[in-house]
């Protein structure tokens, strides 16, 4: 037994290199186009790491921000803080985001993922081609004033066109533009419901019913107005069209 214990470290030292030799190493292979293709472990590591950035990409590089803010402002304008619930609004915003972003996703799949899966391009080229449709989408929704603001803050000088806008300037400019657009849409939504609140409050004051909360009386009229104008179809359709106009 003692001999076995004394020999065990030596056997372990001899077996370890053989065991690691069976594992696929971190290697790169040249591609026909002149690029390089990394081994499967590296690609798997990059893929798993990229999954952690999906929430940030969903929030900051898609139409999700504008949609969820508008839905939240609509709920406040109606005076129903818990209806629809957060889960319903998030689900509707996610599906609407997928619908709006589907042309961008299709372009990324065709231009970047398919050639990369067929080993026609390298991982770096796939990332560059996959980022291009997102850049074009964000540039269409970003105001020039916001781009100029962050370009001045970054001291990059005058930009020589859309292709010269770096991501570190485009991302905050896009988010700022989306916030402004969402609040503009929210202001438009608030106006008819605010008029109903003012009318109900004035009527209650004229009747001497100061103890009756105006929000309780105004809520049925707000819901009736929203249903009569087919508010959900109008709002969802306007949101979708705002990204293509």
Swiss-Prot record:
A Pfam family matched in the record: FliP
Signal peptide, first to last residue: 1-21
GO biological processes: bacterial-type flagellum assembly; bacterial-type flagellum-dependent cell motility; bacterial-type flagellum-dependent swarming motility; chemotaxis; protein secretion by the type III secretion system
Major localisation: membrane
Claim: Cell cycle is one of the keywords in the record: no
Keyword Transmembrane helix: yes
Subcellular location: Cell inner membrane; Bacterial flagellum basal body
Coiled coil: none
Alphabetically ordered keywords of this record: Bacterial flagellum, Bacterial flagellum biogenesis, Bacterial flagellum protein export, Cell inner membrane, Cell membrane, Membrane, Protein transport, Signal, Transmembrane, Transmembrane helix, Transport
Transmembrane segments: 45-65, 88-108, 185-205, 209-229
UniProt GO cellular component terms: bacterial-type flagellum; bacterial-type flagellum secretion apparatus; plasma membrane; type III protein secretion system complex
Entries under InterPro entries matching the protein: FliP, T3SS_IM_P
Membrane topology, from the record: Multi-pass membrane protein
Its job: Plays a role in the flagellum-specific transport system.
Family per record: Belongs to the FliP/MopC/SpaP family.
Name of this chain's protein: Flagellar biosynthetic protein FliP
């Amino acid at each position: 037994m003692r001999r076995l214990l004394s020999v065990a470290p030596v056997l372990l030292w001899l077996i370890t290199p053989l065991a690691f030799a069976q594992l696929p190493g971190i290697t790169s292979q040249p591609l026909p186009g002149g690029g390089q293709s990394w081994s499967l472990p590296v690609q798997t590591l990059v893929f798993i790491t990229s999954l952690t950035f999906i929430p940030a990409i969903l929030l900051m590089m898609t139409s999700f921000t504008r949609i969820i803010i508008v839905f939240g402002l609509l709920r406040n304008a109606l005076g129903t803080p818990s209806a629809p619930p957060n889960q319903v609004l998030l689900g509707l915003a996610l599906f609407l985001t997928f619908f709006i972003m589907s042309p961008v996703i299709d372009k990324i799949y065709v231009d970047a993922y398919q050639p990369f899966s067929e080993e026609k391009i390298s991982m770096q080229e796939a990332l560059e081609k996959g980022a291009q449709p997102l850049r074009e989408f964000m540039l269409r929704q970003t105001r020039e004033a916001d781009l100029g603001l962050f370009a001045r803050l970054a001291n990059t000088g005058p930009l020589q066109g859309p292709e010269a806008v770096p991501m570190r300037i485009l991302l905050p400019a896009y988010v700022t533009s989306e916030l402004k657009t969402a609040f503009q849409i929210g202001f438009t939504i608030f106006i008819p419901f605010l008029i109903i609140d003012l009318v109900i409050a004035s009527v209650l004051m004229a009747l001497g019913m100061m103890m009756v909360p105006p929000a309780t009386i105004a809520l049925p009229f707000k819901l009736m107005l929203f249903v009569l104008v087919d508010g959900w179809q109008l709002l969802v359709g306007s949101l979708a069209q705002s990204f293509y106009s």
